[in-house]
């Protein structure tokens, strides 16, 4: 309502007339999706049709890699790429741990240095670590434990409420013509405006790991990749 008040003051954007919004059609209407009754959509619809809106596009979720890190959050709507990884910034390099996972493991009395090293050995995944309850494993899957089809399905669910588009990254361990074509067509059939932002793959070679005990098997901590500066704010 506050946005509508400001829109009334400044007036609608120049090509508002004839747009779907001018006809009372929200993005979810264009997707044939029925929203929850949490909000009074009909009142908002009538007000927009009467007064217009100042901006034709308002929502475009992006990765926000740098800004998310400031508050120790993960990038926007993305799953974690690892439950423990190293982060490189202008201030230096430091280790980041999934704070939500660590809190639950602490609550269960499981978190310790040995478990931390096991997570590093398993490249940030907890799926094959004995002793961790299955409900925690189910909750804290990383992207390499997930089906990309499920990520596209979630993007479809969000899409009905996104007027512009979303920067959706996908992860494939060994990308090839077959799986990339399958993903792109699945996203297209789902109605996504943008089929993919970045395609991420696993590194062919793993670096020597110096953060675990010498007598343990070395493995890599996932490192975050460079992000689009426009999206990182």
Where are these regions (language model features)?
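Extended, well-ordered alpha-helical scaffold/bundle regions in very large, multi-domain proteins
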Residues: 1-23
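Short acidic, low-complexity intrinsically disordered linear motifs used
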Residues: 220-233
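Catalytic alpha/beta core of large soluble enzyme barrels
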Residues: 5, 12, 25, 30, ...
């Amino acid at each position: 309502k506050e946005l509508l008040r400001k829109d009334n003051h400044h007036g609608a954007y120049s090509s508002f007339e004839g747009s779907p919004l001018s006809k009372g059609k929200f993005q979810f209407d264009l997707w044939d999706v029925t929203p929850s009754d949490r909000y009074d959509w009909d009142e908002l619809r009538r007000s927009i049709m009467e007064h217009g809106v100042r901006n034709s596009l308002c929502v475009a979720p992006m990765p926000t890699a740098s800004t998310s890190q400031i508050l120790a959050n993960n990038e926007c709507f993305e799953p974690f790429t690892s439950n423990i990884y190293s982060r490189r910034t202008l201030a230096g390099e430091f280790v980041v741990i999934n704070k939500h996972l660590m809190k639950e493991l602490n609550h269960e009395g499981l978190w310790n240095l040995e478990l931390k090293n096991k997570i590093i050995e398993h490249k940030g995944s907890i799926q094959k670590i004995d002793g961790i309850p299955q409900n925690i494993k189910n909750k804290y899957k990383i992207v390499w434990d997930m089906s990309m089809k499920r990520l596209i399905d979630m993007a479809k669910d969000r899409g009905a409420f996104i007027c512009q588009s979303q920067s959706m990254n996908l992860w494939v361990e060994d990308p090839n013509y077959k799986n990339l074509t399958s993903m792109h067509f699945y996203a297209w059939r789902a109605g996504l405006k943008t089929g993919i932002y970045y395609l991420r793959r696993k590194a062919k070679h793993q670096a020597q790991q110096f953060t675990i005990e010498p007598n343990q098997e070395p493995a890599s901590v996932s490192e975050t990749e460079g992000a689009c500066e426009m999206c990182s704010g």
